[in-house]
Amino acid sequence: MSKRIVVISDTQIPFDDRKQLKAVIGYIGDTQPDEVVHIGDLMDYPSPSRWTKGTKEEFAQRIKPDSEQCKRRFLEPLRQVYDGPVGVHEGNHDRRPVDYLHQFAPALVEYVSSFQFQNLLDFDGFGVDVLPEFYKIAPGWISTHGHRGGVRVTQKSADTAYNAMMRFGTSVIIGHTHRQGIKPHTLGYGGNQKVLWSMEVGNLMNMKLAQYLKGATANWQSGFALLTVDGQHVKPELVPIVGGRFSVDGRVWEV
């Protein structure tokens, strides 16, 4: 039998698009995939960001409240409808509290576990795993958030994942860019071929809440991704959210 994996990315709670996130959780509950992977930047954690250093936001004391929002809007609703395996990559935003501690309070680093996102969000209590930086998500495929491994980030959809694919020599699925795109590349000689695939998942963030855009519209696409696995066969598929709807296998979900 085939296996289906749902991959979501860059919710950046509390700046998530709440309607989109709720609809995707509803889809997961309706279809019961074999695995759910959040590919990183589950959280935003703006207070310890380098961009807010020295501003009022740095003193907002919102790490705990934001973590509670994640529990209420993502982890609790997800576990109410789905009891299968859930794994989360640590994105660059997810580790902002830890990075802040290392940089500005090194005397307290022995307490670093208290600032790790898996503990702030009680992953153990929700039965959620922290995935390795490079996760063998399917035969011939790895998933990673996309901010590490020497990957060159570009502004065109799928090109960052393509750079990762060529660097790693395997099919790759990433988040980080907030863009959606799929791009293959064929290698071989003498008519023999090996096709590698690269995919960027998109995001479930509310762009209007991204203050660092300063009112601009970024080249981001809302949606998520699917991997359908049957033995060594892996089909990558993007699910864009457009006009308040998305569709999978001929069925439409409203946002």
Curated annotation (Swiss-Prot):
It holds the Pfam family Metallophos. SUPFAM superfamilies: Metallo-dependent phosphatases. This is Gene 54 protein. It comes from the Viruses. It comes from Mycobacterium phage L5. Coiled coil: none annotated. GO terms for molecular function: hydrolase activity. InterPro entries: Calcineurin-like_PHP_ApaH, Metallo-depent_PP-like.
